């Protein structure tokens, strides 16, 4: 991983490899983030290649923005966030009974909007409420967990 930081801007380029079964998978990643006052922006592109052309390469993109509004009472800040992410058809690298890789995760687009309330010390925790909207090609039947939904999370930082 290579990281360059300058005046609120952060660039990251990385490479990873994994071999969940018989096929080596290479992941190439480039990302950029920028902080300006209470605003934070981030974009990332990932390319996933499977050895021996055993599965079509995967493209993934993520764009994110957030605005932090300082608070003075129970919560330290309230953050408003939006995100867009995309991933083309994807395989986890584990072959079927015929030894071939197959689509485990269908191509999708997702838009997320949410609000987070952050506690200050001594708790270091967040309460987040998001709405996630998924977009698929016609005729695609997504997994139960990947339909439009409202998500409420409680996160503790250690």
Please annotate each region the language model reported.
Residues 8-158:
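Outer-membrane beta-barrel pore domains
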Residues 2-4:
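Short, small-residue-biased leader/transition segments that mark boundaries at the very start
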